[in-house]
């Protein structure tokens, strides 16, 4: 296994259900060695309370909060959270993304200096004709 680790960057606003699902997929399928950096953009759905609970039990989590009342937006959060990440390798990971087994190994295997690596999935159309 590579000794390199990834900082997963996860900004969110009122996506608690998906954020829990996404976090659990990272920890279940990739373990606890990777950092997750969360940003809460003035949520009112319990996101901040949940993030505080996760932070207490997971040492590789950082949490940041916009107390509002104005939202900062996803572009601000990606920039801010990248600055807070402690690893050289960062992965933008939306709150509704799921980490499949070996995602980290595949990303790190393909990564070369100066290159950008992306992962995606293809979904069937929601409304096929």
Question: What does each of the following model-derived ranges do?
Answer:
Residues 67-85:
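Glycine-rich, basic loop-to-helix element that forms the pyrophosphate-binding segment
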Residues 104-119:
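Conserved donor-nucleotide/metal-binding helix-loop-beta segment in metal-dependent transferases, i.e.
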Residues 24-33:
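Short, acidic, metal-binding catalytic loop of nucleotide-sugar glycosyltransferases
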Residues 90:
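Short aromatic/hydrophobic "clamp" motif used to bind/position activated sugar donors
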Residues 1-25:
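N-proximal low-complexity "stem/linker" segments adjacent to membrane-targeting elements
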Residues 52-72:
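Conserved donor nucleotide-binding strand/loop of the catalytic core
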Residues 40-49:
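A conserved acidic beta->alpha catalytic loop
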Residues 117-129:
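Short beta-strand-to-loop element that shapes/binds the nucleotide-sugar donor at the catalytic cleft/hinge
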């Amino acid at each position: 296994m590579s000794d390199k680790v990834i900082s997963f960057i996860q900004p969110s606003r009122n996506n608690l259900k998906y954020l829990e699902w996404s976090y659990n997929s990272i920890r279940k399928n990739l373990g606890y060695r990777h950092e997750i950096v969360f940003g809460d953009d003035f949520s009112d759905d319990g996101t901040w309370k949940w993030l505080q609970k996760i932070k207490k039990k997971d040492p590789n989590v950082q949490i940041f909060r916009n107390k509002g009342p104005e939202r900062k937006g996803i572009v601000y959060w990606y920039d801010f959270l990248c600055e807070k990440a402690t690893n050289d390798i960062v992965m933008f990971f939306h709150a509704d993304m799921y980490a499949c087994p070996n995602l980290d190994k595949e990303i790190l295997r393909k990564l070369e200096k100066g290159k950008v690596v992306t992962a995606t999935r293809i979904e069937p159309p929601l409304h096929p004709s």
